């Protein structure tokens, strides 16, 4: 399988900083036993698997409203 790049993920989440936050949270979910959203055919590490999920458009995120 081809290498995953930040540019692949930025097509789904256009802000680099938000991408890092979403990827970190999703990776923690996988480490705590969360179910993978795509098949891990290459037996990648959880961080790489998380980035593949984001690039595939399988990870949803929501920006919380600011408190006034």
Swiss-Prot record:
Keyword Transcription among record annotations: yes
Gene Ontology biological-process entries: DNA-templated transcription
Any one GO MF annotation of this record: DNA-directed RNA polymerase activity
Top-rank lineage group of the source organism: Bacteria
InterPro entries: DNA-dir_RNA_pol_omega (IPR003716), Pol_omega/Rpo6/RPB6 (IPR006110), RPB6/omega-like_sf (IPR036161)
Pfam family name, one: RNA_pol_Rpb6
Gene3D superfamilies xrefs: 3.90.940.10
PANTHER family the UniProt entry points to: DNA-DIRECTED RNA POLYMERASE SUBUNIT OMEGA (PTHR34476:SF1)
Protein name stated in the entry: DNA-directed RNA polymerase subunit omega
Biological source species: Syntrophotalea carbinolica (strain DSM 2380 / NBRC 103641 / GraBd1) (Pelobacter carbinolicus)
């Amino acid at each position: 399988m081809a290498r995953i790049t930040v540019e692949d993920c930025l097509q789904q989440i256009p802000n680099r900083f938000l991408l890092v936050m979403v990827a970190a949270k999703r990776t923690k979910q996988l480490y705590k036993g969360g179910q993978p959203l795509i098949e891990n055919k290459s037996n990648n590490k959880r961080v790489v698997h998380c980035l593949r999920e984001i690039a595939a458009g399988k990870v949803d995120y929501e920006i919380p409203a600011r408190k006034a």
